[in-house]
Amino acid sequence: MTLAIAMVSCGGNATNGGRKAQELSGAGATFPLPFYNVVFENFAQVNGDVVAYGGIGSGGGVRNLRDKIVDFAGSDAFLTEKEMADMAPVVHVPTCMGAVVVAYNLDGVKELKLTGEVIADIFAGEIKMWNDERLAALNPDVTLPAEAIIPVFRSDGSGTTFVFTDYLTKVSPMWKEKFGAGKSVNFSSGQAAKGNPGVAGVISQTKNSIGYVSSEYAFALKIPYARIRNVRGEFVLPSSATISAAASGVIPADTRTSITNVDAVGAYPISTFTWMIIYKEQNYSDRSKEQAEATLDLLKYILSDEVQNITSEVHYAPLPAKTKELNMTNLKTVTYDGVAILQ
């Protein structure tokens, strides 16, 4: 298996309280990888700790954490009750928010409007042609080609797929009944690709294709993406403001929540938190206390204003203040040999 590894070198000016610099490992979601690449490099410079992260998909990251071979998992899908029952107690730490965009490759089409129902019908294979009357009705000023639609989706266990299909189950009874939500879904037709980079690459190279990716990947490859109608009837593009609007409601204490298709003015409907997930008891697999301390130092660094301000620069959105407060409260429950690490 080929892993997408983001690894940075140790820097000077460490502010780690005098402990020995550590090597941390994580694996999981590719959705936040552009943000994490920046964060891990900066963290090495200010704290002296090295972070190696394998972008293998949320499902793979959760499996690695379950098998206790990483310090943290990255996931765009919070763990289900069943998944948590199969593991020791964990803490979910939202690190930023982002958007799943519906990107497309159509000659001459710079703007496209879609509804959730139409997106569901496309990925279910019920809308097969770009000039379908339902697409034409949403885009009366756009000349859509008489060409077959090529859906592109993830081949690996993916939090991005979970967010996308979670949204579709909320807007399409057909999708909920036939496909449901999950990290892996049996799409009826189209082309599969691994990771957000893989899906974005296929879309960029395939005329008449459409697929779902993290917004940063579409932006990096200059792939256009659709305005999507939200609950309020607004056709919205993702931005820091429209993603933040989706998180304006109440967040539960354990931070496990979906913010797709929320009823809020200006909200982008396929928005999500992305999480780092760690074990509540950090003494496992011969990990040292210093390694546990470095893991929490990384998470505290990500929650800092300095790092949260970076999110918008790489097409994500910062965490709401309340979510940051919940994170710090939850991190104070993390222990090493039963003793809280943060005092």
Where are these regions (language model features)?
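Sec-dependent N-terminal signal peptides
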Residues: 1-2
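Flexible loop/hinge segments at secondary-structure junctions
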Residues: 10-343
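C-terminal motif of bacterial Sec signal peptides marking the signal peptidase cleavage site
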Residues: 5-9
